[in-house]
Amino acid sequence: MNSILITGATSMIGVALIEEALANETEVFAIVRNGTRRLSRLPSSPLLHVVFIDSLNEYQSILKNITKPIDVFYHFAWLYTEKQYRNEPVLQNENIAISLKMVEFCKALNCKKFVFAGSQAEYGPRTDKIYATDRVAPVLSYGIAKYAAEKLTANLCSQNGIVHACGRIFSVYGKNDNEGTMLNYAISKFKNKENAYFTSGQQKWDYLNEKDAGNAFFLIGDKVNSNFICNVASGISLPIYIY
């Protein structure tokens, strides 16, 4: 794997994948939204090419900026990830159309492998161990849209001779985690020597560090050569209070 393209490049897992790719001397084209406040997250490297865009729907306008053949197309970008938007059907539906556009983008680049970032939310509420072969039963609009986008992009890839791989992301944490997560809340309180308040912490969570998630997606792109689905998780689920 000599070169990759990433949408959602300034997201936590996007940055982690970029760092992993650069460590393996893989050239990276990072698609970044104009005006993003997270540009400083990206590392500096002659192998990293930042390509700015106003909207992913306008991908044709940046084709000329992709100056090398792309071996793997990673689609991490997703709108309306904030908690208040996760059950908004109309908003989440926008992501399905964008995801299909990204397969068209992949095809326009003559790239033969498309990696989609799925989600634990596709399985719906569960208390037992989850396997990638399990039946999906999403409840929130976010999970429904993720599964719809996963299946539809897989179909479109199949129609165009493109390998489709999906990593369904569970609970990832790290230096670029979003504000407001439990871990960020706790760390912030502890650093300021303030009290932090929690529930009894009986819920079970499978936490994975962002670096490991970046490595997982790198390996998916590098090693997978046929249609593929996996869970991106540690495989160990523990009650929150233990963490």
Which positions does each model-derived feature cover?
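Conserved glycine-rich Rossmann-like NAD(P)H-binding loop of the short-chain dehydrogenase/reductase
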Residues: 26-36
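NAD(P)-dependent short-chain dehydrogenase/reductase
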Residues: 128, 151-205, 210-214, 218-221
